[in-house]
Regions:
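Cell wall/extracellular polymer interaction/catalysis modules
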Residues: 33-113, 128-130
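Sec-dependent N-terminal signal peptides
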Residues: 16-18
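Boundary at the C-terminal end of the N-terminal hydrophobic targeting segment
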Residues: 29-31
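Short, cationic motifs built from Arg/Lys/His that form the positively charged side of catalytic pockets
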Residues: 11-12, 69, 167
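N-terminal secretory signal peptides
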Residues: 1-9, 20-23
Length: 189
């Protein structure tokens, strides 16, 4: 009798497990047929600064437009990684070596001529403030019109959404701004 109870018990477990599997199968099959969804998140592929620069100097920033992440190294080698917004198209993207030439603690915004050409409804000028597209801080690069800056529109982070600049959450640009001296080496890849 004891042997029979054990076999009944194992048959019950088998039947119960089969029932559970049948209940789960439709949702598993449905998940396989859905198209993949592109998420608003960065892959945070990281780089080694030594692959791009000879020395840390005053610090290093590498902005990766593929992984949509900014890496910052301070002079002591401490690394920080942040999600970014990147240019909407490759035509708007400038890549290569540059550096920080000016730190703007309250950026105002003047759309570039090409931005105004693409969208004539843009204002000619916007003073510093909560609606300013450059956010609360801006780091100017040697390339005209190119910046690393904050953004008031947090939906842009992790996406191709800028007209050429690298955008960060406002709280992140404040951190980067505080650690970044003029002369910091920058590479956009």
């Amino acid at each position: 009798m004891k042997e029979r109870d054990q076999s009944l018990l194992s048959r019950r477990r088998f039947v119960g497990g089969l029932g559970t599997a049948m209940l789960c199968a439709p949702s598993l099959l449905r998940a396989e047929t859905l198209a993949p969804v592109r998420r608003n998140a960065s892959s945070f592929r990281t780089h080694s600064w030594q692959d791009h620069f000879d020395t840390l100097g005053k610090g290093i920033i590498i902005a990766d437009t593929i992984s949509r992440a900014l890496q910052q190294w301070t002079t002591d080698g401490t690394m920080f990684v942040y999600p970014t917004s990147v240019p909407m198209t490759d035509e708007l993207t400038r890549r290569g070596y540059t550096e920080i030439i000016f730190k703007d603690p309250e950026p105002d915004w003047t759309p570039t001529p090409s931005m105004r050409e693409r969208d004539p409804t843009l204002p000619a000028y916007m003073p510093p403030g909560p609606d300013n597209p450059l956010g609360v801080r801006s780091l100017h690069l040697t390339w005209q019109y190119y910046r690393i800056h904050g953004t008031h529109d947090t939906r842009k982070i992790g996406r191709r959404s800028s007209s050429g600049c690298i955008g960060l959450y406002n709280e992140h640009i404040i951190e980067v701004f505080e650690r970044t001296p003029v002369g910091t080496q920058v590479k956009l890849i």
